[in-house]
Amino acid sequence: VRADLIERERARRTTDLAWPRILTGIARMSKNAVDIAMVGVAVGSAGIAGVGFASPFWGLAFAAGGGIAAGTIALVSQRYGAKRLGAVDQAVRSSAAVVVALTLPLIAIFWFFGADLVALLSNDAEAVALGATYLRVVAFGIPFAALNLVGSRVFIGVNDAQIPMVLRSGGAVANAVLNAVLIFGLDLGVAGAALGTVLSNALVTGIFASGLVAGRLPGLGELPVQIDPRGSYLGDVRELLDIGTPVIGRNLVWTVAEIPMLAIVALFGPGVVAAYVIARRIWGLMNTPGWGFGLASSSLVGQALGNGHEETAEAYGREIVRFAVAVYIVSAAIVFVFAKPIVATFAGGGSESVISVAVSLVSAACVAIVLQGVSGAAAGPLDASGDTSWPFYSQALGIFGVAIPLAYLGATTSLGLYGLYLAFLAETTVPAVLNYYRFATDKWKQVSRQHRPDAPA
């Protein structure tokens, strides 16, 4: 506010929605980092690599769930802004039906073909076996993880980010505790890490569902919204798919890209794979502000559009981009200075060579993450309006068109690890430029008029 980046009231509303989501992200990413450290201590670097190889497939839960959840927040926020609360119920029921239909088949695929899928990424027999074990078990948590994304977006769409923070952060803590018991207490290794993830996600889903239906939660009191489970589950499916399919594609870009990316990183050797997995976990932690600002932007812009206040929607979008970049600069500087002790903490006793490579990758990520602030925050208004195709194309171009080729050049030429450093930078630069350009054109406002509560069917 003092730097004149954002108007005071908009800063307050943005912060109210963003900080709980940021804390939730930190809790979840910290849990992931702790998982990696636990697996590293219990199984070694092969276990870290195995979990890393399984991660792209687990990421399908967040690709499908996150895509439909983008449609959820767009519809819920616009209908809430227009005071059409009955229409909120329909959006939530349809969202739940779609994510369950999308994710249930993945359980069977990963259970029966998990080993074959992980083997696509590496010829390291031990890492492949461990990754396949992890994937077969964790697959049962995919529908729960996707439903949790929808549940959290419902609350954020109605101006309440604290309840999702409490539930999902609590789930992350429960996950870490369960993993410690299962990995070390019962000596289940990577299977224990996967089982802990399944159980904790199922617990959070149950709490979300019971709270939304009852309209209240013990200890948290009345909720801002109550969902009637009776009624059609298909009414908003078409709109959800129109908005959510490009977001699923955008999420799948990285999930799918991880497969060739990890295969390319494997050409550097198992030590670099372990370092890359560690760096990616730390990247996830650094990226948590973007989740908060992106969702805050989607909610606030969506509510303004639902009220027909397009100028207010634009002001929120533009100022949240500035706010996000300022926060990213500060957080990236802190991580850059303390990169070595941070990596050593997450490495779980890894070798000095692994730690050294991971530190260099994290340092490169600190530069790239600032542009992620632009990309993610600029995508928020586009998601809120239903203009979700542009961020999908920009993400695909950045990763498949630039980042992966640079990584491959690093693995096959004298460019070496510099190829991975440049890949981090390309991954965020291209979407940042293209997403902000699309936001600046104002075409997203035109798209939003097709999805507002008073729009013709």
Question: Where are the model-predicted features located?
Answer:
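Helix-loop interface residues and adjacent transmembrane-helix termini in multi-pass membrane transporters
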Residues: 30, 42-45, 79-82, 157-158, ...
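Small-residue-rich hydrophobic transmembrane alpha-helices
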Residues: 48-108, 145-164, 273-333, 337, ...
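N-terminal transmembrane alpha-helices
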Residues: 5-42, 56-71, 75, 103-107, ...
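Transmembrane helical elements of multi-pass membrane transporters/channels
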Residues: 16-39, 137, 200-204, 208, ...
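Interfacial/gating helices of multi-pass transporter permease domains
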Residues: 39-59, 126-131, 190-195, 239-243, ...
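Short alpha-helical transmembrane segments in multi-pass integral membrane proteins
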Residues: 1-18, 76-141, 190-244, 301-368, ...
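Hydrophobic transmembrane alpha-helices of multi-pass small-molecule transporters
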Residues: 63, 175-179, 205-209, 285-288, ...
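Cytoplasmic helix-loop-helix junction between adjacent transmembrane helices
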Residues: 123-124, 128-131, 138, 142-173
